[in-house]
Swiss-Prot record, chain B:
Name of the protein in its database record: Dolichyl-diphosphooligosaccharide--protein glycosyltransferase subunit DAD1
Keywords assigned by UniProt, alphabetized: Apoptosis, Endoplasmic reticulum, Membrane, Transmembrane, Transmembrane helix
GO cellular component, as recorded: oligosaccharyltransferase complex
Protein species of origin: Citrus unshiu
Function per UniProt: Subunit of the oligosaccharyl transferase (OST) complex that catalyzes the initial transfer of a defined glycan (Glc(3)Man(9)GlcNAc(2) in eukaryotes) from the lipid carrier dolichol-pyrophosphate to an asparagine residue within an Asn-X-Ser/Thr consensus motif in nascent polypeptide chains, the first step in protein N-glycosylation. N-glycosylation occurs cotranslationally and the complex associates with the Sec61 complex at the channel-forming translocon complex that mediates protein translocation across the endoplasmic reticulum (ER). All subunits are required for a maximal enzyme activity.
Length: 433, 115
């Protein structure tokens, strides 16, 4: 009986290993933990969650202060991505706190954070750790008296219709988003020195961030297109974070009409915008991998351990992009390889055969030492590729120099004439009286 | 004044010529050999000045062969000259043997460095 129990526990503990999860071979996240303030969000945001589950994600909904939640157990992460739809949470339950969320992102997992007009300090702190600063005034919302959404009741212009998207097909998809996106919440600003954050949806130049219920006593600190409504961060370990100040942006919406324009859209751009950007955040698009780095002398096929100066060599690499279901060849004309020793001696653009194979031929420079083949590829919205392979380069051997140069014929002639002269002189000297 | 210095120079030149005519033929042959070596060296230097010093090792090798030959020939002339008190007891065959051996080493080095 005890043995049966033992075998049973062993068998059940092995089951998690068989589940399909986040791995380098399949980079799309699968298991997503969604933390909410109350479960009514499940129905008010059902369209967004439905689009996620239809693409194969396993969502797990928990209350933000549920004492049983945890991101990892026994050192292994239970989820591949985290969605924080709990703007008013004061303290997370279980073992989650700001430090564990930061560790979660540092280990390469993705994060979506949605704040709202009642955002707590905890959510603001999470956003600051990610590089985004929400407006410090807790009662401020983004107001725009020119680009607000027309609605049936006389609003205070906090529901704005924005179409100031970033121009990046890899983040927002190749199909243009026709209808503006509805937004109602707080705005944030980005540090211009931070090169990892991007403004995906920015407010128009007539927007400002202030308390809608009170009169303005001093000019608002955040104005114009410095206000970002939706931002993304791609960390150096390729973890992706989406931060926005409006939870209601994700909710089920109907049509929109921008004030000042006569076009009345049946459907707002929210659904298309959020679907496309979620695809990017969860690594269904824009995720590159580089495999099969090879280099060899032109004409040979095996990889030498050392090159000589002034050798002709060929370098090749294969780059693939994850399409959500499979690895497709990545086609681009701006991947470059460097032959680097303290500074690049050779910088060459790799040519592609359109099937993901990139190659370039160049001549080893006239300098010997230990070089590296370096490919540093960082493009907006794509994961960064940083490949480096070390290879030594030796100078000429004693018998590899050029011989019988036409320019040196006079010197050869003089050396031989000296030898001939010496020979003739010895004869004359010996046999003259 | 200029005329007398001109006459002195001419007189000097004439006395040099007549003194030189009195040297033994052997030494004159060695002098000719040295002149040939120096002349070849000069040709190479002029060539390098025109064309540039690309195979510098070849240039050095060529010039050194000429200069080395000239130096060894001058040493032979010193040792063989009967008027030279210092080498009175040195048999001229010994001097010649030294000359031949040194030239062999010189040409070995030149061939190695010629590239």
């Amino acid at each position: 009986m005890a043995k049966l129990l033992l075998y049973l526990t062993l068998a059940t503990s092995l089951i998690p290993l068989f589940s399909v999860a986040f791995s380098p071979e399949n980079p799309t996240d699968r298991r997503v933990l969604v933390l909410v303030d109350d479960f009514a969000i499940k129905s008010s945001h059902s369209l967004y969650f439905g689009s996620l589950t239809s693409r194969g994600f396993q969502l797990e909904f928990k209350l933000a202060d549920d004492p049983n939640i945890g991101l990892q157990r026994y050192g292994q992460y239970l989820y591949d991505a985290l969605v924080l739809f709990c703007p008013s949470v004061e303290r997370f339950g279980g073992s989650i706190d700001v430090a564990s969320i930061v560790d979660f992102v540092d280990s390469g997992h993705d994060l979506i954070v949605a704040a709202d007009s009642n955002a707590s300090d905890l959510i603001r702190e999470v956003a600051t750790e990610c590089g985004v600063d929400f407006d410090e005034d807790p009662a401020a919302m983004v107001i725009d008296h020119i680009n607000y959404a027309v609605s049936n009741f006389d609003g205070d212009h906090t529901l704005i219709a924005s179409d100031d998207f970033i121009k990046a097909d890899v983040i927002l998809g190749s199909k243009k988003i026709e209808a503006p996106v509805l937004f109602q919440g707080i705005g944030h600003s980005l540090n211009p020195a931070n090169s990892l954050v991007l403004k995906v949806l920015s407010a128009s130049s007539s927007a400002y961030s202030a308390n809608p219920k009170s009169k303005l006593s001093n000019p608002p600190s955040l104005t114009g297109s410095a206000i970002s409504l939706v931002s993304v961060v791609q960390a150096r370990n390729n973890a992706r974070i989406l931060i926005t100040g409006s939870l209601s942006m994700f909710s089920n919406r109907s049509g929109v009409q921008k004030a000042g324009s006569s076009i009345k859209h049946e459907k707002s751009g929210n659904e298309q915008f959020l679907t496309e950007i979620s695809k990017w955040v969860f690594h269904e698009r824009g995720h590159l991998k580089a495999v099969n780095v090879r280099h060899h002398k032109v004409g040979e096929s095996d990889e030498p351990a050392i090159y000589r100066i002034n050798d002709d060599l060929e370098y090749s690499v294969e780059i693939y992009e994850w399409s959500g279901t499979s690895w497709e060849p990545y086609v681009s004309d701006d991947v470059q390889v460097q032959f680097y020793m303290m500074s690049p001696y050779v910088l060459k653009t790799l040519s592609t055969d359109q099937k993901g194979h990139y190659s370039a031929e160049f001549k080893v420079p006239d300098v010997y030492g230990v070089f590296q083949f370096k490919v540093e590829y960082q493009r907006l919205g794509y994961t960064s590729l940083s490949l480096s392979k070390q290879i030594p380069v030796r100078p000429y051997r004693h018998n590899e120099y050029e011989r019988f140069l036409p320019a040196a014929y006079p010197y050869y002639g003089s050396a031989f004439s000296m030898m001939a002269g010496f020979f003739i002189f010895t004869i004359v000297h010996l046999y003259s009286k | 004044m200029a005329r007398s210095t001109g006459k002195d120079a001419q007189a000097l030149f004439h006395s040099l010529r007549s003194a030189y005519a009195a040297t033994p033929t052997t030494l004159k042959i060695i002098d000719l050999y040295v002149g040939f070596a120096v002349f070849t060296a000069l040709i190479q230097v002029v060539y390098m000045a025109i064309v540039g010093s690309f195979p510098f090792n070849s240039f050095l090798s060529g010039v050194l062969s000429c200069v080395g030959t000239a130096v060894l020939a001058v040493c032979l002339r010193i040792q063989v000259n009967k008027d030279n008190k210092e080498f009175k007891d040195l048999p001229p065959e010994r001097a010649f043997a030294d000359f031949v051996l040194c030239n062999l080493v010189l040409h070995l080095v030149i061939m190695n460095f010629l590239g």
